[in-house]
């Protein structure tokens, strides 16, 4: 008797987990309404990288974006924003190509940075 109760519970649990995974995989991430680079930065990025881009150390290390030579070209920030790495969450499903290009341009031309070149949505699409 106990074995059949256990098997029934186990079977129902597996079905519930599988259904939940299917739901999560089929759900689309909500989109951020902001389209300007500064607005996107302050809505998402500044919580960890700080409003002035100086970064922080607390529960983790949040690298400074201000004066960061890794931002000289657009490839690194496009990759990090789209795919994430370690504590940096991937935002590629949350932001569209134009939003990623806008925030990349913002961090490369503000926060004490003045790197050359503009990133386009096409650059982001090609890097995905």
Regions found by a protein language model. Give the residues of each.
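Positively charged n-region of N-terminal signal peptides that target proteins for export
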Residues: 1-5
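Flexible coil segments in periplasmic/lumen-exposed cytochrome c-class electron-transfer proteins
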Residues: 21-29, 97-98, 102-128
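Stable alpha-helical elements in mature extracytoplasmic
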Residues: 33, 73, 77, 99-100
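Electrostatic cytochrome c docking/interface patches
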Residues: 20-40, 56
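Bacterial N-terminal signal peptides
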Residues: 7-15
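Gly/Gly-Pro-rich "capping" loops immediately C-terminal to redox-active cysteine motifs
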Residues: 50, 54-94
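The canonical Cys-X-X-Cys-His
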Residues: 37, 41-51, 103
């Amino acid at each position: 008797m106990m074995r059949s109760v256990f098997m029934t519970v186990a079977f129902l649990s597996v079905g519930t987990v599988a259904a939940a995974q299917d739901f999560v995989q089929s759900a689309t991430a909500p989109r951020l309404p902001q389209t300007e680079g500064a607005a996107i930065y302050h809505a998402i990025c500044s919580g960890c990288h700080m409003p002035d881009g100086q970064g922080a150390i607390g529960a983790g290390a949040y690298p400074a974006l201000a004066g960061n030579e890794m931002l000289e070209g657009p490839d690194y920030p496009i990759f990090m924003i789209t795919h994430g790495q370690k504590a940096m969450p991937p935002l590629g499903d949350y932001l569209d190509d134009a939003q990623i290009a806008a925030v990349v341009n913002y961090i490369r031309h503000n926060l004490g940075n003045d790197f050359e070149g503009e990133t386009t949505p096409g650059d982001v699409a090609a890097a995905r």
